[in-house]
């Protein structure tokens, strides 16, 4: 029995040592990311004059445009409605005293990229924020989605094609200059399957994998590419208006997220969201999480349909 007991002792000792080292490293890394941060990286003086933001007139996109302008970047605002673009552009120029440029484009279409390429020609772009996105009006079974064929095309064009094409347009000049940051705003919904939002969740999983793969490809070229995976933020897309500790305003979220750049390839961007991401993706069994998310979706779907029926 002694050899067996000795073996058990060493297995236990190595396990305790590994857990201790792992816990210590997690603590040190957490302090580095969430307390010390890397806020000084995101400056026009170190990356390049211009920051390009898609979906820039509302929510997280607008918050990125404003915060990057505050840090000294000139801003290219890309969104669908010229009137909203002009309004945000004027406000940013007035408040932050930086140059702006607007490009109106409907990312639901695939023929917009020559226009965008022309609008970006000659600009020294230090930052690209691929933020534009679309979700479901309400949770629904895949085959029950109204006009599902059009829905599929629109969501893929906006959530996936925009990220690929905007990266294609901007990345070459970043590589030439050996510096630049690309932030691809995915969603915590891309960390695991979300039944009844299946297509949306899948597009965000694509954005996450695309970002992490490209970061590995171009890190040696001096480029940072980060996958940003927020949980709920008070935006039109989330339909939540009242901020809480775990549901921040876009402004609060963006300020926190920008401090993680260069420290995390894949980031929830905000400490409460990082804790939620760790619990849901690492601690909860997949079957239990799937059951919980499905139940939540069914409840939201029932409330929406009841409200629609009542008129």
UniProtKB/Swiss-Prot annotation:
Substrate binds at residue 187. It catalyses: a very-long-chain (3R)-3-hydroxyacyl-CoA + NADP(+) = a very-long-chain 3-oxoacyl-CoA + NADPH + H(+); 17beta-estradiol + NAD(+) = estrone + NADH + H(+); 17beta-estradiol + NADP(+) = estrone + NADPH + H(+). Gene3D superfamilies: NAD(P)-binding Rossmann-like Domain (3.40.50.720). Pfam families: adh_short. One of its GO terms (cellular component) is endoplasmic reticulum membrane. The keyword Lipid biosynthesis applies. GO terms for molecular function: estradiol 17-beta-dehydrogenase [NAD(P)+] activity; oxidoreductase activity; very-long-chain 3-oxoacyl-CoA reductase activity. InterPro entries: NAD(P)-bd_dom_sf (IPR036291), SDR_fam (IPR002347), VLCFA-Steroid_DH (IPR051019). GO terms for biological process: estrogen biosynthetic process; fatty acid biosynthetic process. Its EC number is 1.1.1.330, 1.1.1.62. The active site is at 200 (proton acceptor). It is found in: Endoplasmic reticulum membrane. The chain crosses the membrane at residues 8-28, 125-145, 269-289. It is a multi-pass membrane protein. It is an enzyme of class 1 (oxidoreductase). Keywords: Endoplasmic reticulum, Lipid biosynthesis, Lipid metabolism, Membrane, NADP, Oxidoreductase, Steroid biosynthesis, Transmembrane, Transmembrane helix. Pathway: Lipid metabolism; fatty acid biosynthesis; Steroid biosynthesis; estrogen biosynthesis. NADP(+) binds at residues 48-77. Catalyzes the second of the four reactions of the long-chain fatty acids elongation cycle. This endoplasmic reticulum-bound enzymatic process, allows the addition of two carbons to the chain of long- and very long-chain fatty acids/VLCFAs per cycle. This enzyme has a 3-ketoacyl-CoA reductase activity, reducing 3-ketoacyl-CoA to 3-hydroxyacyl-CoA, within each cycle of fatty acid elongation. Thereby, it may participate in the production of VLCFAs of different chain lengths that are involved in multiple biological processes as precursors of membrane lipids and lipid mediators. Belongs to the short-chain dehydrogenases/reductases (SDR) family. 17-beta-HSD 3 subfamily. This is Very-long-chain 3-oxoacyl-CoA reductase-B. The gene is hsd17b12b.
